[in-house]
Design a protein with these regions (language model features):
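Helix N-cap motif at beta-to-alpha junctions
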Residues: 274-280
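Beta-strand->loop->alpha-helix junctions that form or flank phosphate-binding loops
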Residues: 28-31, 218-219, 237-246, 263-266, ...
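Active-site glycine-rich loop that binds ribose-phosphate moieties when present
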Residues: 133-147, 182-206
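Active-site-proximal betaalpha loop/short-helix elements
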Residues: 90-92, 191-267
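Glycine-rich anion-binding loops of enzyme active sites
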Residues: 42-50, 54, 79-176, 297
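Acidic, Ser/Thr/Pro-rich beta/coil linker or hinge segments at domain junctions
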Residues: 2-3, 7-11, 288-327
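Small-aliphatic-rich amphipathic alpha-helix that forms the alpha element of a beta-alpha
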Residues: 58-83, 100-111, 199-206, 225-229
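Extreme N-terminal cap/leader segments of soluble proteins
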Residues: 1-57, 85, 106-110, 114, ...
Length: 327
């Protein structure tokens, strides 16, 4: 199996096929495009849970992991409450570096108004860089919990922000010394500044307040992977207009430089939303300072189409994230 997400066929055959449901209080089950689980806490309330793993540099790992977990959590329509963290550190890892990671985690939790509720930290010979797993918990009214299972044909797909947000940031940060030979420092800084857009909490709250059917965030594999997963979870087809998908100029330039596809590059920070009246939702989001556009709609059947002017092609199951060609 290649680096990145385990292929959908493997997940279905070797993971999901073996899992059985036992507890009636557990309202959701694992599946493609299912980003969170829900546990019935009372006749009215549901506790939602989501998890996300990250490995890498100490200055990135905390903020990225927190946002990935909370991003998955808020897709249910839930208000996030707190996180648990599990961290595996390589031998020789310094206490000062651990402090940096925890400080960054706490800083992101402060911004999101959530608690660090606990966790586990250990040094392991099995890893050669820090590995951080964040589990987020939240709460939502049962009547307000969102699910892709409720999507119907004809509903529109609204996308917030732009494709390739996280990938552009990582490439600009990790390859700055190489990119500086072609682009000026302001351009590279603009790409690195995309880190501040990784959270979809504001997007999701605005969408939930408006009244939408379901949401799915774009993460590993990019916008194309997210669209496929959204359609899988909904058991629907879709058609998407390529030119409606937002791209920052920094993303276009850097992807061209490295010869990678921005639509298949990690895109944390962008949210896909299923809604009846996409234009009205876009207006609602833009009034709150969130860039958004209608990029397509769901339809009956299994066809998942990408339309680029007169060219129509089929969306394929997610591939290895394009960023692994470079980092």
């Amino acid at each position: 199996v290649k680096i990145g997400k385990v292929p959908e066929t493997v997940l279905k055959r070797s993971v999901f096929k073996q899992i059985r449901k036992r507890q009636k209080e557990v309202l959701t089950k694992p599946g493609i495009g299912h980003d969170y689980s829900g546990i019935e806490a009372s006749s009215q309330d549901v506790i939602t849970i989501a998890t996300a793993p990250v490995s890498g540099a100490i200055d990135d790992i905390g903020p990225i992991a927190v946002h990935m977990a909370v991003n998955n959590l808020v897709l249910s329509g839930a208000t996030p409450l707190g996180i648990m963290q599990t961290m595996l550190l390589p031998e020789g890892f310094r206490e000062a570096e651990l402090k940096i990671i925890i400080k960054a985690i706490e800083a992101q939790c402060l911004l999101l108004n959530i608690e660090v509720m606990g966790g586990h930290t250990e040094v392991s010979a099995a890893v050669n860089c820090p590995v951080l797993v964040i589990t987020g918990l939240g709460k939502v009214k049962k009547t307000q919990m969102l699910s892709p299972a409720n999507i119907i044909a004809g509903q529109e797909i609204v996308m917030t922000k732009w494709a390739g947000i996280k990938g552009t940031y990582l490439l600009a940060k990790d390859h700055e010394s190489e990119l500086i030979s072609r682009y000026n420092r302001d351009f590279i800084q603009g790409a690195k500044d995309l880190l501040k857009y990784l959270s979809v909490s504001k997007d999701a709250k605005a969408a939930a307040d408006f009244g939408v059917t379901a949401m799915h965030d774009a993460a590993r594999g990019g916008i194309f992977a997210a669209l496929w997963e959204f359609a899988e979870a909904a058991k629907m087809g879709l058609k998407v207009y390529l030119k409606k998908i937002g791209l920052k100029q920094e993303t276009v330039e850097i992807c061209n430089y490295f010869n990678i596809n921005p639509y298949q590059m990690t895109s944390e920070g962008s949210l896909l939303i299923a809604v009846g009246k996409g234009d009205l939702l876009v207006d609602h989001l833009r009034k709150q300072g969130i860039e958004a556009s209608v990029i397509g709609q769901f339809m009956e059947g299994n066809d998942r189409l990408i339309i680029n002017d007169d060219e129509i092609r089929y969306l394929e199951p997610p591939r290895t994230d394009e960023i692994y060609k470079v980092i």
